[in-house]
């Protein structure tokens, strides 16, 4: 399965060895891919169809568009369902299994604007974000009736995989109360999205409407075990492991990878190498990131920066990682929510899904991760 989820924009930036415009610097080992996503910074996804074309969910939701030229241009929207039906699919992660089944996960929300009680530092009873699923077995020509496997308050999904065993594994945040925070489940399907099982809860504490265990990235190791890298407000990812296809996550520990309060993206390549792109805790040559105020509703004492994205790789299933290298930095607006797609074996596309406008689109060969992706001097305006 090839999956990428993103916040995209219509215009891209060409990568070169110097500043790409007055505010952005891109590592010289990276070039610009053909990918130019439709729409604005809204949650979208892109998958590779069986014939090599690309498909993404339209930024307005309830429709798909297809590219036959590697993402340069996109077709007119094809509706998923009638706008008059009781449940209309919104934007969300789109998965294509190896069997050719498309799975669209989406949320139906209520009470979003008043979701947080600042005085109680907790979620309001009116806030709902139910998780829904619809499937297509003919590459989007027709879709099944949407099903709601889980009701409640579920958060943004930033990563999903189909493991070699065929299980579809999707980390998803869930709103927890008293105090208000996020926890994380994995939802697992052994039948290409027809039915779903929810794992045990990952709860790391916290208090804030962006605090806790949130927006996890998931990958598979060579021995079939799964790992989630969970976004936290604790100055680093937490590593959570499963040895039973994602149904139970029994081993939890703080990662050796420092990270700010932002999600990363980890991708297992065809070669077996793991690639991670993320916002480190501090800028490469800057002062330590300040902690947020304890009264901030987002986090409780979190730190981080979104001015730089770093990349690293592992050749031993995450036991060790190559020294992180900054691949893009921006002096004013932020860079965050990265995504990695192995478009072809050894060809990586990387882009940002939130923060900067236009988004960053990067391309690099896997061989260059070892040979050319080295630390370069700090960018000077």
Where are the language model's segments positioned?
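Bacterial N-terminal signal peptides
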Residues: 1-10
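Asp-box/BNR beta-propeller blade signature and adjacent active/binding-site loops
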Residues: 15-381
């Amino acid at each position: 399965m090839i999956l990428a989820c993103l916040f995209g924009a219509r215009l891209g930036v060409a990568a070169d060895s110097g500043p790409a415009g007055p505010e952005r610097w891109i590592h010289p080992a990276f070039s610009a891919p053909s990918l130019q996503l439709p729409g604005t910074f809204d949650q979208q996804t892109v998958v590779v169809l069986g014939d090599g074309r690309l498909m993404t969910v339209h930024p307005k939701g309830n429709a798909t568009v297809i590219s036959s030229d590697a993402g340069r241009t996109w077709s007119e929207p094809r509706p998923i369902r009638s706008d008059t039906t009781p449940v209309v699919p919104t934007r969300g992660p789109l998965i294509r299994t190896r069997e050719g089944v498309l799975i669209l996960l989406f949320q139906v929300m209520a009470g979003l604007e008043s979701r947080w009680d600042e005085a109680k530092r907790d979620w309001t009873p009116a806030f709902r974000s139910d998780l829904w699923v619809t499937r297509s077995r003919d590459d989007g020509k027709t879709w099944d009736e949407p099903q709601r496997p889980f009701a409640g308050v579920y958060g943004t999904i930033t990563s999903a995989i189909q493991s070699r065993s065929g299980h579809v594994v999707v980390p998803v945040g869930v709103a927890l109360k008293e105090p208000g925070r996020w926890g994380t489940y994995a939802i697992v399907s052994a039948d290409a999205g027809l039915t779903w099982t929810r794992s045990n809860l990952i709860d790391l504490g916290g208090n804030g409407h962006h605090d806790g265990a949130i927006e996890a990235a998931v990958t598979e190791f060579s021995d079939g075990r799964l790992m989630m890298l969970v976004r936290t407000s604790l100055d680093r990812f937490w590593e959570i492991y499963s040895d039973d296809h994602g149904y139970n996550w029994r081993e939890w520990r703080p990662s050796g990878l420092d990270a700010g309060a932002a999600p990363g993206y980890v991708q297992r390549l065809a070669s077996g190498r793991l690639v991670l792109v993320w916002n480190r805790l501090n800028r490469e040559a800057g002062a330590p990131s300040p902690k947020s105020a304890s009264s901030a509703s987002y986090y409780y004492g979190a730190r981080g920066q979104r001015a730089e994205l770093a990349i690293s790789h592992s050749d031993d299933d995450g036991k060790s990682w190559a020294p992180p290298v900054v691949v893009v930095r921006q002096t004013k607006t932020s860079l965050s929510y990265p995504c990695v797609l192995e478009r072809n074996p050894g060809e990586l596309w990387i882009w940002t899904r939130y923060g900067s406008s236009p988004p960053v689109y990067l391309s690099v060969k896997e061989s260059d991760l070892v040979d050319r992706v080295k630390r370069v001097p700090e960018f000077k305006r």
